[in-house]
């Protein structure tokens, strides 16, 4: 099981709680808002441990309990587009501003420039950082695609920018949601 980068496409705001018994609401995920889903925590997709941008603008952990249909949508259901790279079709997401890119180990790899895209095969997110989106390629500002590799892996992660924004109009990494 891996973590996912998700988008709320339920059509409504979904409450976020500090625990699984819903005793303390600490925020909400609005429609078309992005967040990281820590599936490794467990919860059988009923108790969903997430990382989200709270009302103070900080990253916070919490739980969505019994999510409505569409709330836990994979970001790859709403990509910016697709791109065929070396014969394989990838989902792409575009960046409003530059963002750090990391190797699979979490060590620095480089960055993606503003107005460039990243390409991935799935909605996978980081184990230690569910707010980091798993990627395979970065679009060069000079054209072409550069594989994100290192430490024996052919993928890495990009900081999707939840600490900056999480709504469709404010998140640095965006698709068509």
What residue spans do the PLM features occupy?
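Short alpha-helix capping/helix-loop boundary micro-motifs
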Residues: 19-24, 102-107
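SH3/SH3-like beta-barrel superfamily modules
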Residues: 25-69, 112-163
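Residue-level detector of intrinsically disordered/flexible regions characterized by low predicted structural confidence
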Residues: 42, 86, 96, 102-105, ...
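SH3-family beta-barrel domains
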Residues: 1-18, 28-31, 70-100, 111-114, ...
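Generic secondary-structure boundary/loop-capping signal
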Residues: 13-14, 23, 61, 109
């Amino acid at each position: 099981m891996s973590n996912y980068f998700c988008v709320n496409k339920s059509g409504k705001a979904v409450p976020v709680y500090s625990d699984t018994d819903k005793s303390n609401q600490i925020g909400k995920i609005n429609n078309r808002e992005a967040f990281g889903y820590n599936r490794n925590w467990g919860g059988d997709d009923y108790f969903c441990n997430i990382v989200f941008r709270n009302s103070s603008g900080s990253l916070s952990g919490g739980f969505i309990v019994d999510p409505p249909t569409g709330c836990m949508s994979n970001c790859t259901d709403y990509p910016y587009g697709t791109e065929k790279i070396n014969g394989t079709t990838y989902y792409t997401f575009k960046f409003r501003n530059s963002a750090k890119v990391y190797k699979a180990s979490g060590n620095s790899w480089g960055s993606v420039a503003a107005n460039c895209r990243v390409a991935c095969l799935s909605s996978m997110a980081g184990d230690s950082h569910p707010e980091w989106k798993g990627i395979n390629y970065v679009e060069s500002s000079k054209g072409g695609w550069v594989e994100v590799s290192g430490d024996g892996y052919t993928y890495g992660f990009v900081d999707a920018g939840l600490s900056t924004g999480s709504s469709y109009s404010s998140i640095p990494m965006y698709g068509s949601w």
